[in-house]
Amino acid sequence: LVSVFCICAYFGLAHAQIPQEIWKESEQIEKQIKKTSFPDRVYNIKDFGAKEGNNGEIFCHEAINLAILTCSQAGGGTVLVPPGEFLTGPITLKSNVNLHLEEGAYLKFSSEKYLYTPTVLTRWEGVDCYNLHPLIYAYGESNIAITGKGIIDGQASNDNWWSMCGAPHYGWKEGMTAQKNGGRNKLLMYAETFAPIDKRQMTFEDGLRPQLINLYRCNTILIENVTLKNSPFWVIHPLFCESLTVRGVKVSSHGPNSDGCDPESSKNVLIENCIFDTGDDCIAIKSGRNADGRKWNVPSENIIVRNCEMKDGHGGVVVGSEISGGYKNLFVENCKMDSPNLERVIRIKTNNCRGG
């Protein structure tokens, strides 16, 4: 299931050179993307017990999650992260909540692995499983946002998450936990033998790093203006989502598998005015790996990428490699992809069992 229209300023193609019916289709897709809207209520995380500091002892995730839950149960509004440094564990978004980081707000995620349990339902490299809690996660929520001019820092480095990829140049040493020690192969075997998803319980010892932001079966989503740094794994991972806007976001993460934004089996997506400076693909379109992708058979479709800058990464706009559910209607316009650090501008990854 393939239909792609890629139009990049890099290639010197003028808007007028492309058949107008193609642009009209992208305009119709954009009209289908629902916009978030929130009541005027504001919930400051300090009012729920969040304290500034980065000494490794004071964690703010309980206060932040309480503020989010209270806001959602009251009908929605804005959960405010004021200026200052806040050390936190995993955050769970709820419907009708805008998590807003004011300029000067610095949300730093701890690398203490025990904080990211119990596991949650997700996908890891296109395979369904229960894995470590993403740093920011939502399941089945609607009308949610992460906005503001603050910084969200996963604090991943060779000293913690990145070494789990199993590569010595990312800090791995013999005897350390790593995905190559059997965890990744175990997950792939679960999928190929059609093991029930609730039996696919991955643990820290399996070495499968969590995403920075993972939104699962959510709709009407906005991620705007924030800076995202140092992700353990993929940075923005919408999964089975619909009506997503990613606007004005700066991504800076040079670890292994630090994809910038990976819409997976998602529909009606706009990514615009963003800067991607990554250790892997800047944007990668996905729809599941092998058996799991074919089982759900949900393509990624109606995706618009425009006015973005790809400064570093394996590929600017990439399809795959986990693309077994197919993809269609991908529009790329006026993106700057001329950095000497960018390996490829457009890349389609495929093989005979995965699609693409």
Model-derived features with residue positions:
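Right-handed parallel beta-helix
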Residues: 103-104, 142-150, 219-229, 242-253, ...
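Extracellular "leader-to-stem" segments immediately downstream of a signal peptide or signal-anchor
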Residues: 6-8, 12-217, 222-224, 233, ...
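Catalytic metal-binding/acid-base residues of hydrolase active sites
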Residues: 86, 151, 336, 351-352
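Short glycine/acidic-rich loop motifs that flank beta-strands on beta-rich extracellular proteins
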Residues: 76, 89-90, 110-112, 132, ...
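Short, solvent-exposed loop/turn segments at secondary-structure boundaries
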Residues: 55-59, 294-297, 319
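Short, contiguous acidic/charged loop-to-helix segments that flank catalytic cores in large enzymes
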Residues: 320-323, 349-356
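Bacterial N-terminal signal peptides that target proteins for export
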Residues: 1-2
